[in-house]
From Swiss-Prot:
UniProt-recorded name of the protein: Molybdenum cofactor guanylyltransferase
Domain notes: The N-terminal domain determines nucleotide recognition and specific binding, while the C-terminal domain determines the specific binding to the target protein.
Cofactor: Mg(2+)
Function as written in the Swiss-Prot or TrEMBL entry: Transfers a GMP moiety from GTP to Mo-molybdopterin (Mo-MPT) cofactor (Moco or molybdenum cofactor) to form Mo-molybdopterin guanine dinucleotide (Mo-MGD) cofactor.
Residues bound to GTP: L11, C12, G13, K23, D66, D97
InterPro entries referenced in this protein's UniProt entry, alphabetically: MobA-like_NTP_Trfase, Molybde_CF_guanTrfase, Nucleotide-diphossugar_trans
Subcellular location as annotated: Cytoplasm
Protein family membership: Belongs to the MobA family.
Keywords: Cytoplasm, GTP-binding, Magnesium, Metal-binding, Molybdenum cofactor biosynthesis, Nucleotide-binding, Transferase
Length: 191
């Protein structure tokens, strides 16, 4: 299996409360962070989609909107909505605020898609990264079951589903732009 046979979905629906503004629209090199991620991953994957609660991008991207079945704002709802759009395949899911994840990290996770796992996510010494990994579309119903029990964290899946945590030593590749200072620092590194 090759990366260019797979689909990628960039999650853009977070509240961005720590950042104080919508992270998906932060500007990097004359484009917003969403466009930055879509451009990068379009060179790697078959198709790149954007997941959000509503179309805040004026039809600029292939959009997967959150399901209206549940009136919550959560990663589990986003994952359920994403996986419901695909049939019998793995989908790479990444949050928009992880701009340093690239092909090297993907290639390290890729071989585990051929094994007996339904979830393959990145893990560093300090964190598991549930919003950086491959999820099998067959998990949509499991996500729905958790939503019906009002369990919103993707981490609940790991205890029920065969999950591979792919170990990475370098925390830097998994930087999350949670605060404005982190965004400013990353922006200055791009120059």
């Amino acid at each position: 299996m090759q990366l260019n046979e797979l689909n990628c979905v960039i999650l853009c629906g977070g509240k961005s409360s720590r950042m104080g503004q919508d992270k998906s629209k932060l500007i990097l090199k004359n484009q917003n962070l969403t466009q930055f991620q879509v451009n990068k991953f379009s060179k790697i994957f078959k198709n790149v989609y954007v997941s959000a609660k509503e179309d805040k991008f004026e039809n600029h991207f292939n959009l997967i909107k959150d399901s209206l079945e549940f009136e919550v704002y959560s990663p589990m709802l986003a994952l359920y909505s994403i996986l419901s759009n695909f049939k019998n395949e793995f989908v790479f899911v990444l949050s928009v605020d992880s701009p340093k994840v690239g092909e090297n990290e993907l290639l390290k996770m890729l071989p585990f898609l051929e094994q007996n796992y339904k979830i393959i996510i990145a893990k560093t010494p300090l964190h598991k990264h549930p919003l950086c990994g491959f999820y099998h579309s067959s998990l949509a119903q499991t996500c729905k079951n958790f939503l019906e029990k009002n369990e919103q964290k993707i981490g609940f899946l790991f205890s029920e589903i065969k999950t591979k945590f792919v170990e990475f030593e370098n925390e830097d590749a998994f930087l999350n732009l949670n605060f404005y200072e982190e965004y400013e620092k990353f922006k200055s590194e791009l120059k």
